[in-house]
């Protein structure tokens, strides 16, 4: 036998006498009832085998015309609409809207009101990240983290309820401050929770951070470079996971963030795993901020709402003694206050990214136009670009790392 090899058979489909078949692309619907869709998302996926070639997001299934509805209501009656946008962390959205109106009116918020706002913004951040991190783990097969995460979320929901009376749609922030002061017992309970929470985070990290399966499903999946993050208009963890140190709490401080000590976690690779690590570390930093707020709230006292009865209602006792207070109360709850004509943009570092409100006033008691800049919207529009070339199983991992809630996308 010589070392020569036999000539290869010609590359012809009919060598074996088989009919020639064309490989066709396969289209499937992902959602809107899929548990990994995180809401009413419908994705039409075009697959070549198991490789994703195209993703077409269909949105609008939760559209309620929020921006248009706001044009028919006085300013004070439009605050509850913001609770229903990103309903995982409602108070952060209220904050942006109140900031916009305060800019128009030139209202100064008392220090204690700013402290409470800062505290509850960070509670919202932890509520959001706990839900995102644990459900992302569930999407790739881990069932224990959601149980532990929801136990802590329940405690935070009770803090919401003790401050505002509602677990979810709080309607707690007001133009000029917050609706009512926090009792010292509540502040102490939040402080005690801050002491215990890092241990819970350690337990959750012990389950999934170095888990081989979790890393295989997230490392080098959905990579976003710095340039791509900026080009797509990303914000929040989506840019910080790619290594861009952009956080509005530092770069454009509002409330009392300029007086707080905290670090901004950054990723290196810009993949799903780095975004997960950023969120885990952000929860630790939020706990630090909450602890600082609790210490200051326990040591100080003062008003939580601006003492201007053209904007904030007078107290009940005052209304029984003063006719002016009664008139102010009546005018506030029937007509509301008027803002000077002009336009203003206010934004906050919401858990999902930069949540902005562009408010146009025509001098009446209602917004002429209120444009909401939802951080999840530019993230979702990049789904097609981020998923191309990935496997079908990676779609849910990428979607989970984007952190999408449909209240704010469809509005």
Curated annotation (Swiss-Prot):
GO molecular function: NAD binding; NADH:ubiquinone reductase (non-electrogenic) activity; quinone binding
InterPro entries, per database record: NADH_Q_OxRdtase_suD, NADH_UbQ_OxRdtase_49kDa_CS, NDH1_su_D/H, NiFe-Hase_large
Main subcellular location of this protein, as a coarse class: membrane
Membrane topology: Peripheral membrane protein
Domain of life of the source: Bacteria
Broad enzyme group: translocase
EC number: 7.1.1.-
Pfam families noted in UniProt: Complex1_49kDa (PF00346)
Catalytic activity, reaction form: a quinone + NADH + 5 H(+)(in) = a quinol + NAD(+) + 4 H(+)(out)
Assigned keywords, A-Z: Cell inner membrane, Cell membrane, Membrane, NAD, Quinone, Translocase, Transport, Ubiquinone
Record has Membrane as a keyword: yes
Gene Ontology cellular component annotations, sorted alphabetically: plasma membrane
Translocase is among the record's keywords: yes
Gene3D superfamilies in alphabetical order: Cytochrome-c3 Hydrogenase, chain B
Intracellular or extracellular location(s): Cell inner membrane
Function: NDH-1 shuttles electrons from NADH, via FMN and iron-sulfur (Fe-S) centers, to quinones in the respiratory chain. The immediate electron acceptor for the enzyme in this species is believed to be ubiquinone. Couples the redox reaction to proton translocation (for every two electrons transferred, four hydrogen ions are translocated across the cytoplasmic membrane), and thus conserves the redox energy in a proton gradient.
Record-stated family: Belongs to the complex I 49 kDa subunit family.
Complex formation: NDH-1 is composed of 14 different subunits. Subunits NuoB, C, D, E, F, and G constitute the peripheral sector of the complex.
PANTHER family in UniProt: NADH DEHYDROGENASE [UBIQUINONE] IRON-SULFUR PROTEIN 2, MITOCHONDRIAL, NADH-UBIQUINONE OXIDOREDUCTASE 49 KDA SUBUNIT
Protein name (record): NADH-quinone oxidoreductase subunit D
Organism: Phenylobacterium zucineum (strain HLK1)
């Amino acid at each position: 036998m010589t070392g020569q090899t036999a000539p290869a058979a010609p590359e012809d489909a009919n060598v074996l006498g088989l009919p020639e078949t064309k490989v066709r692309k396969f289209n499937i619907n992902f959602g809107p009832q899929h548990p990994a869709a995180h809401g009413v998302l419908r994705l039409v996926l075009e697959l070549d085998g198991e490789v994703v070639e195209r993703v077409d997001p269909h949105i609008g299934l939760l559209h309620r015309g929020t921006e248009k509805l706001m044009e028919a209501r006085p300013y004070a009656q439009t605050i509850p609409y913001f609770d229903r946008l990103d309903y995982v962390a409602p108070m952060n959205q209220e904050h942006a809207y109140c900031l916009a109106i305060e800019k128009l009116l030139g209202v100064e918020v008392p220090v204690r009101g700013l402290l409470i706002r800062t505290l509850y913004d960070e509670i919202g951040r932890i509520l959001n990240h706990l839900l995102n991190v644990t459900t992302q783990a569930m999407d790739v097969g881990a069932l224990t983290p959601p149980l532990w995460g929801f136990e802590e979320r329940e405690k935070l929901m009770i803090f919401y309820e003790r401050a505002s009376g509602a677990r979810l749609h709080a309607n707690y922030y007001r133009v000029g401050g917050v609706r009512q002061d926090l009792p010292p017992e509540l502040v102490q309970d939040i402080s005690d929770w801050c002491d215990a929470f890092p241990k819970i985070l350690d337990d959750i990290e012990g389950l999934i951070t170095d888990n081989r399966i979790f890393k295989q499903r997230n490392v080098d999946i959905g990579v976003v470079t710095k340039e791509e993050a900026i080009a797509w208009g990303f914000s929040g963890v989506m840019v910080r996971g790619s290594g861009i140190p952009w956080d509005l709490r530092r770069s454009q401080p509002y409330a009392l963030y300029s007086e707080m000590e905290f670090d901004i976690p950054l990723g290196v690779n810009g993949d799903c795993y780095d975004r997960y690590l950023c969120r885990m570390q952000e929860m630790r930093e939020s706990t630090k901020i909450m602890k600082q707020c609790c210490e200051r709230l326990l040591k100080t006292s003062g008003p939580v709402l601006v003492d201007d009865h053209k904007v904030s209602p007078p107290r009940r006792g005052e209304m029984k003694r003063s006719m002016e207070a009664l008139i102010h109360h009546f005018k506030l709850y029937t007509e509301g206050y008027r803002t000077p004509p002009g336009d203003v943009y206010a934004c906050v570092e919401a858990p999902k990214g930069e949540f902005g409100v562009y408010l146009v006033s025509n001098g009446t008691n209602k917004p002429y136009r209120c444009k909401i800049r939802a951080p999840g919207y530019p993230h979702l529009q990049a789904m097609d670009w981020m998923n191309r070339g990935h496997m079908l199983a990676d779609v849910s991992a990428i979607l989970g790392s984007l952190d999408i809630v449909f209240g704010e996308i469809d509005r």
